[in-house]
Design a protein with these regions (language model features):
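An alpha-beta-alpha
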Residues: 18-82, 101
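Second-shell loop/turn segments in exported
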Residues: 17-23, 50-53, 150-157, 183-189, ...
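Extracellular/periplasmic periplasmic-binding protein-like sensory domains
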Residues: 115-195, 250-264
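Segments of small-molecule ligand-sensing domains
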Residues: 175-192, 200-256
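Stable alpha-helical elements in mature extracytoplasmic
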Residues: 8, 29-33, 56, 60-67, ...
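Flexible loop/hinge segments that line or gate small-molecule binding clefts
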Residues: 1-20
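Structured segments of extracytoplasmic/periplasmic soluble domains
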Residues: 1, 5, 36-40, 52, ...
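Extracellular/periplasmic bilobed ligand-binding domains
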Residues: 2, 60-157
Length: 266
């Protein structure tokens, strides 16, 4: 069996009896972000930007658009070619359309470029990123810039003090660990999720009483584990049962994430 950590596309576990995941799914994430945009940011016009042909971007934009329009809002969506490095025209378009929020669920490399371009253009429209944006890369790209960034994610530092302390001690114990974490000991959600996935695997091994793959696979369906990112159990397709996401705001002046809300889809 396999346990996915942050693979949010619904198709990952579809029709597969030995693939599990501990994260929420894109339909949930897209809805949560749309609700946050309308309920907390008061947005009625959204500009969505993604990479052309990228299933992750396309799927999340679709889910966001469905929920945002259901809330009474209007959505304009555009897609850039793979390898694009200049986002000036896209951000100009967002302003031209009167966007009150920008949703860009793209990869980290593009996220960093979008942050830099937004800062250079003086974009004040709030930018929403998906779970991929929860990274030190985004923190560094936006440092000192007068831009507003929110992301949806699986964990907020401070959620489990014991885990936080242990992770930071491990990071700071080795220069290679520190370098691999972008030179600091900030805890991104994927680190906490990776830890929980590992612990879920151990729980399945203990329940199975064996290292036999079939026995471990059978045991996984019934695993219930209180992780650092929340309670974990699996539904009939192997997906984790999750009902909330963490929305974080980036304090660009101090290069730190702050918890903005714990948001559900309803």
């Amino acid at each position: 069996p396999a346990i996915g950590v942050t693979c949010t596309n619904p198709s990952v576990t579809a029709g597969n009896t030995h693939y599990f995941r501990i994260c929420f799914l894109d339909p949930f994430q897209g809805t949560v972000l749309a609700n946050y945009a309308t309920e907390k940011l008061g947005a009625t016009i959204a500009y969505c930007l993604g990479e052309l042909g990228n299933d992750y971007d396309t799927g999340l934009i679709y889910n966001f658009k469905q929920a945002f329009e259901k809330n009474g809002g209007m959505v304009v969506d555009e897609y850039f070619q793979t390898g694009n490095t200049d986002f000036t025209s896209y951000l100009t378009n967002a302003s031209m359309y009167g966007a009150q929020v920008i949703f860009a669920p793209c990869s980290l490399a593009y996220a960093a470029l979008i942050c830099s371009a937004a800062g250079a253009q003086g974009v004040t429209t709030p930018i929403l990123g998906s779970d991929t944006w929860d990274s030190n890369v985004v923190v560094d790209a936006a440092a000192g810039q007068n831009i507003t960034i929110y992301v949806s994610t699986f964990y907020q530092e401070g959620g489990s003090p014991e885990f936080d302390a242990g992770f930071k001690a491990w990071i700071n114990s080795d220069s290679v660990h520190l370098a691999n974490n972008n030179g600091n000991d900030m805890i991104s959600a994927v680190s906490a999720m990776g830890y929980d996935a590992y612990m879920v695997a151990l729980e399945a091994l203990k329940a199975a009483g064996s290292k036999d793959p079939k026995a471990v696979n059978a045991a996984l369906w019934d695993v219930k584990y209180d992780g650092v990112t929340g309670a974990i159990a699996f539904d009939e397709t192997g997906d984790a049962i999750r009902d909330v996401a963490f929305i974080k705001h980036l304090d660009t002046a101090n290069s730190a994430w702050e918890l903005a809300a714990v948001q559900g889809k309803d």
